[in-house]
Amino acid sequence: MDGIISNGSPGASVTRPLPEPLEKPPTPPPPPPEDSAAPPPPPDTSVPPPPPEDAPPAPPPEKKKKVGWGAKRPAATPLSVEELVRKKREADAAAAKPKFLSKAERERIALEKRAKEVEAGRRFKSEPSTNGTDRSGTQSPSVYSETPNGDERSIPTGPRAMRNSEVPTGPAAMRNKNYDMSPPPPPKPMSFSLTDGKGDSKRQAEEDEAAAQAALIKQKYMGTEKTSSFSAKKKRKRTTDRKFNFEWNAEEDTSGDYNPLYQQRHEANFYGRGRLAGFGDDVADTLAQKYARALEDRDREAGSIRAREILEMERRRREESTRNQLDKHWSEKKLEHMRERDWRIFKEDFNISTKGGSVPNPMRSWEESGLPKRLLELVDQVGYKEPTPIQRAAIPIALQSRDLIGVAVTGSGKTASFLLPLLVYISELPRIDEFEWRKNDGPYAIVLAPTRELAQQIEIEARKFTQPLGFNVVSIVGGHSFEEQAYSLRNGAEIIIATPGRLVDCIERRLLVLSQCCYVIMDEADRMIDLGFEEPVNKILDALPVTNEKPDTEEAENSAAMRSHRYRQTMMYTATMPSAVERIARKYLRRPAIVTIGSAGEAVDTVEQRVEMIAGEDKRKKRLADILSSGEFRPPIIVFVNIKRNCDAIAREIKQMGFSSVTLHGSKTQEQREAALASVRNGSTDVLVATDLAGRGIDVPDVSLVVNFNMANSIESYTHRIGRTGRAGKSGVAITFLGNEDADVMYDLKQMLMKSPISRVPEELRKHEAAQSKPNRGFAKKSDDSSGFGNKSGWQ
């Protein structure tokens, strides 16, 4: 029987309880289930040992190596620097080379890392501390165990007085008070990595240094970031602590009902009879009329006279005040009321700038120009409604017999600005056909133009004014025989329009003299210098008489002194001012007034410039076909190329597209040139394909589109090319095909597009390397075929 101890005799048996064990025995494991089968025996795969006679001989015993200070040490090999450097380079290359990890591998690595961190944190929390609690503050089950009676007994870990009580959690004075002292918070989870802290700190320092260096570079090039938190849109509450609030509203004020100062207002008149200080003119007029009526009522005879005088004085005062007022625009004022401020605003409106002494103010309309009545009637008949900026500024200066340099954009109406003062000048001279000797002394005025087409165009424009006035105009250009031109000069001519080369030939052949020439005009002077006409121009100007040359003193700026004597007057018009043009101006012009419209070399604001980066002839031809067939632009259309050989090829391509086309270049005869321009002007031809020969001065009306199939060699030529459209205040479009071969002009082209208010710079041009800085043109060489004259230098 359990729990009973016998002493050996059957009758005497003493029953005693067994002593309680110190600990409960462990619970035995449950028996295996009955249906579980026994595991099978292991397979007999072991090989039996070989018999003694078949066993291999035993190896000889190894000699016991000597250990200690007397043992032979292996020879030490020195470290190879090259090997260390090679290993370091391989390690750096392997570390720098990116390693591709698939998405599944990245997820697996992340899960393993997270599991390790969780396991490390769990182990850290489960480790018991010295006071018998784990890291979270709870008691460890290995320290406190429950006895069979249900009480808790623990191994003594402190004084006897504290064994059966709670563990103290504070000072003795605070133990019996109800203070809730929570256990300390658990430590933050620690992350374990394979690398030590020194490597991490070093890598972190390198990353911080690289980030600081990148921030400095960004601040240098991008500027400091604006860290202001101010926002104008942010609503702010107004504080009312300093605002005094009354206990009543303003509508409750009844002081005006019984106060006589508010009921009977006194009308005070001071600062002159009838004037109330601080009031406007309308109130002053009312008071003046009231005072005049009072005078008439008092005295019918003398009072009415005095009243009329007062009203007249008020009217003159009002006119005098309106003369100096600032609220009216210059277009609403009379000429005598214009002040210096009004003229400054007027010049800014038309982008006019003048230099020189005693320069007169520009004209606001044709009626204020000072031209004779007969010329004003012709101007109205021709159809000039409003003067252009160059006409507003140049005509008043030229009418004062001043020398003039006009710097204006192409297509700005320069022809009329020098023709009208010229006609006024020669209309005061004797008729050239009055005596025979006057016919033989040459013309009164000469007009020099760089190309034949421009000279003929000036002749057509001049005949609109000279035929009604009875003056004779003759053009002398190449392409015509000398006999034909001599026949045109048989009756004399007041005005001769010529190219410099042919005019020099006529002077050397004694077909023409300049004995009485007193008016010289050079149109497109910079173009004449580009074509090599500097020497012919100097010969022509040296052939002029010196008896009527102006003095190079301050009298040349005095209009009264210049008009008292018929001095020679010289005018020069140009789009740019190269050094050769300045040299001619200093030599032959006397104290000239300089008029600049806009900026030198700029295109007019009426031309929309489009630039397309297209490389290759085939792609450009395809793009040209798309533009012409789009129907956006109506003929006439001008296509510019750089080389004469390309003109005919492009013209053939355009004809295959279904459009009529003609060519214009230096190899054409004069008759072919005139026929080509006439066909474009009368509308029988849609497209004109030309070189820079047609880039200047060719006035084809209503050109809607200019296509630069090849970009011009200089920005000046480009300016005059696109100036063929958008003339006389009309709008136009210029499309340019650009390639890498045009790197020399990309910077200037980008600057011109940025200045134009209606044009846009394409991103390809904006980011191109050649468009970032101005190139060095010291060694730039222009093509010989670009001028359109071949080896003739444009003289004929």
UniProtKB/Swiss-Prot annotation:
Residues 395-595 form the Helicase ATP-binding domain. The gene is prp28. CDD domains: DEADc_DDX23 (cd17945), SF2_C_DEAD (cd18787). A motif (Q motif) lies at residues 364-392. Pfam families: DDX23 (PF25430), DEAD (PF00270), Helicase_C (PF00271). Residues 1-81, 113-212, 760-796 are annotated as: Disordered. It comes from Neosartorya fischeri (strain ATCC 1020 / DSM 3700 / CBS 544.65 / FGSC A1164 / JCM 1740 / NRRL 181 / WB 181) (Aspergillus fischerianus). Its EC number is 3.6.4.13. SMART domains: DEXDc, HELICc. Residues 18-60 have a biased composition (Pro residues). It comes from the Eukaryota. Residues 606-769 form the Helicase C-terminal domain. Component of the U5 snRNP complex. One of its GO terms (molecular function) is nucleic acid binding. Coiled coil: none annotated. Gene3D superfamilies: P-loop containing nucleotide triphosphate hydrolases (3.40.50.300). This is Pre-mRNA-splicing ATP-dependent RNA helicase prp28. Keywords: ATP-binding, Cytoplasm, Helicase, Hydrolase, mRNA processing, mRNA splicing, Nucleotide-binding, Nucleus. The Q motif is unique to and characteristic of the DEAD box family of RNA helicases and controls ATP binding and hydrolysis. Residues 1-12, 127-148, 786-796 have a biased composition (Polar residues). A motif (DEAD box) lies at residues 523-526.
